[in-house]
């Protein structure tokens, strides 16, 4: 897995949602807010690791680094759920990202 892109992550999230469709609420715009809140909770867990141990230690020490990466993966899973909730495709996200990048590159 040399390159891990948005389409692959979206496909994995769709598979996860399908597996638990009888236990979880369906993916739809109304669920987007809940997924945003869950994602913020996961971001808080990332912040706790860095705040408690410092960025250098969190990025260098193996067990702590693994925990940091796991929490960042949780953030990405919720992020991809949010994209699914609002029907945002990888192509739309890519174009918006490029547009924002170009805007930021020309700011100063």
Where are these regions (language model features)?
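Flexible "arm" and connector segments at domain edges
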Residues: 1-108
